Amino acid sequence: MNRTLTDPMVSSFREDDPRPPVPGEEGETTCHHPSKLAMMRPKDPVKTIMADLRCSTARRDEDGLGEPEGSASPDSPLARWTKSLHFLLGDQDGAQLFRAYLEREKCVDTLDFWFACNGFRQMDLKDTKTHRVAKAIYKRYIENNSIVAKQLKPATKTFIRDNIKRQQIDSAMFDQAQMEIQTAMEENAYQMFLTSDIYLEYVRTGCENPSHVNPNGLGGLKLVCGYLPTLNEEEEWSCNDFKAKALATVVGLSAKTLRSPPLRAVEALEKGYRSYRRSDPGNPNRFTSGYSFAPATSANDSEVSSDALTDDSMSMTDSSVDAIPPYKLGSKKQLQREMQRNMRMNGQVSLPPFPRTRRPPKEMTPVEPAAFAAQLIARLERLKREQETMSSLEERLQQIQEEEERDESEMSSSSASHSLPLLPPGTCEEDPQAILDEHLSRVLKTPGCQSPGLLRHSPRSRSPEQRPLPRGGLSTRSQSSSMNGYVPAKTFISRQSTKHIHHHYIHHHAGPKSKEQIEVEATQRVQCLCHGTSECCTAPYIRSRSLGRDQCASPAEVALGHSSTLSKRLCKSGEEVNMEGLENSLLQLPADSTDRSQNVWQWILESDRQTKHKPHSTQNVKKSHSLEPTRTHTWGGGGSSGHLRAHQPAHPFVQDPAMPPLPPPNTLAQLEEARRRLEEVSKPSKQRHSTSSLQRDKSHPVPVQNGSSAFPMDERKDPKKMSGCHSSLGSETVVTYFFCGEEIPYRRMMKTHSLTLGHFKEQLRKKGNYRYFFKRASDEFECGAVFEEVWDDCTVLPMYEGKILGKVDRMD
């Protein structure tokens, strides 16, 4: 009885079940051709062949019914070769046949390496030849980048190399490499060998060998080679009539085909074989690139007994059973569709289990409890550290956010307390004497007034004395006034005679002044005002050029060296100034309890208010000042700290009253600017001097009304030389060059003092072979300069007048 009918999994009868075997052939277990399984799993068809062979050689004792008669013979060698690679290599004939196939495929080194590893494992480690053999195996198969080395993992090759270098020879040294080569052969070469022409030819010739013939051998060979052709009645089949290339196919078992001669059946088989072998010869997996035919249900278990019109023969010739109508034999697509339908119909046929196509992930593999606990503890500790780090970062960010909010609230409260309301319009018309008294109260708030004779270091004044002091001078400065130094007591001081002009130039002969010197200078001027007599206010406004001259000046010269607000108020009033009014103002100094920032804002507002109410007689002077670039003075700075202040507003809407006012400034921005300026005050004096000098250098001098200048000739330098000189003082270097004869040069700022040719080449956008010429000062020619060619990348480029001037030409 068929195994399928007795299988407990298939207990019910179905119409699509395979038919029972022909009487007398019950011993041959029916299995599907491997081509059917190849359609189900096209990537592993040879394993299907192995499974079919195992099914073909199965014993009936598995079902508990005992062995059939004449089926107690052992398995044939051909059937064992298809079980696994070990059975194939364990047989001498199989190993030789497999080696011949590998030699044809040019990958015989894999088999030699496998046998070499087997032989090395059996060697004695104490023998001196063992080390030489291991080294020879390594050099022959692994070191020379052969086909064996390409199939090994890098870690395996590194392990073998290290063991050989350290002479740590072990019998299991090549086990991992042998396992990898064996796996590669099982997946590729072994599967291709089972479908190769060499193996099939050997199977065909093995049929005539008596050692391979047994009562069950034909069944096994039939399954390996394919289905036998249909024989006509009263004819005997022989091996000579069957060709080696006749593999599995489906031949329509119609009445016409059954009555055809054997030659026609063989031709149909050859046609099917050509379609099966259609593949790329360069493809290493040729056995999976084609397709094979599924067996028809009517051809599984029986042959045609006679040509009589019986139920059996009618069922064999019925096209509904064969699933291939006679008129569709030539259509390949139709054959494929019918094969797939037959495969679905015969899907319940019991077949031996085949390996899973997908392996479970590594996480699902069973692990030792101790190793699993160690991995779990390590992961939990890592997670705990990450959570603690994130929590600490969140706490820190929250603290920083709270501190910022607290600082913003404090800043807003301080700005609200320091902000001054706009002065009412009525205050603009107040008495000039009251304004003078208020300004002097801020300037003279120092203990130095109590002892005029001593040069004490007074505490820091509340007025913004650290602001860079603009230069100024009298427009009607004459020889008589400078020689005599005195004028009659009853004279009028007009606006034109006391107008101050801004000159932002550097006194190179005067070094930077410290904070103590600035305070001493201010104290001297204040003390002179406090100790002055009737001669103090009658002297003209004579300025000193430096701190030394200021200290050596006469009391009459220093008397009027106070803030420019006094001179402007005197000019604005246009009235006679007597000493009695000045003494009264000095005696009536009110106490100022406001802080520094409030004084600064009040001082700025007063300056703006004073400028707005100037008469029209000063418009000519304003026009001359409008030519000067407007800029805002910084609070810090040295070098010119000895100059007195003159209220020349730097804002355009103050210079031109007709211009609409700018939007009100932001309080927070003003506080930030004030903080920055106070920080600049605390910087070293040298740095403040260079910074203030660079800032004042950008402006140009304005001549006074009588055509004379308030500065000597040595300070009026060429603007080009001045810009070049001060650019070298900064942290950037000006680089100007002509590129390949272009008319317009290129100019760049490089943040370095010593620029090399290599750095210069890196800045060029276009790369190529060029010649580089740079201008430098030279006395060889009348022009005083030459273009010097530079070749070495490490050479520092020469400078000309504080700049680097170069030309880049293409190399011929």
UniProtKB/Swiss-Prot annotation:
Region (Interaction with GSK3B): 329-415
Compositionally skewed regions (Low complexity) per UniProt: 305-323, 411-421
Compartmental location: Cytoplasm
Post-translational changes noted in the entry: ADP-ribosylated by tankyrase tnks and tnks2. Poly-ADP-ribosylated protein is recognized by rnf146, followed by ubiquitination and subsequent activation of the Wnt signaling pathway.
SUPFAM superfamilies: Regulator of G-protein signaling, RGS (SSF48097), Ubiquitin-like (SSF54236)
Primary location: cytoplasm
Residue spans of biased composition, Polar residues class: 285-303, 475-484
Record bears the keyword Cytoplasm: yes
Record's compositionally biased regions (Basic and acidic residues): 388-397, 672-683
Signal peptide extent: none
Molecular-function GO terms, alphabetical: beta-catenin binding; I-SMAD binding; molecular adaptor activity; protein kinase binding; ubiquitin protein ligase binding
Top-level taxon of origin: Eukaryota
Disulphide bridges, residue numbers: none
Pfam families named among the record's database cross-references: AXIN1_TNKS_BD, Axin_b-cat_bind, DIX, RGS
Segments of this protein annotated with the region Interaction with beta-catenin: 415-467
Keywords, comma-separated and alphabetical: ADP-ribosylation, Cytoplasm, Developmental protein, Phosphoprotein, Ubl conjugation, Wnt signaling pathway
Matches recorded under InterPro entries: Axin-like, Axin_b-cat-bd, Axin_TNKS-bd, DIX, DIX_dom_sf, RGS, RGS_sf, RGS_subdom1/3
DIX domain boundaries: 730-812
Domain RGS span(s) in chain numbering: 84-203
Any GO BP: positive regulation of proteasomal ubiquitin-dependent protein catabolic process
Assembly mode: Interacts with hwa; leading to promote the tankyrase-mediated degradation of axin1.
Role according to the record: Component of the beta-catenin destruction complex required for regulating ctnnb1 levels through phosphorylation and ubiquitination, and modulating Wnt-signaling. Controls dorsoventral patterning by down-regulating ctnnb1 to inhibit the Wnt signaling pathway and ventralize embryos.
Protein name: Axin-2
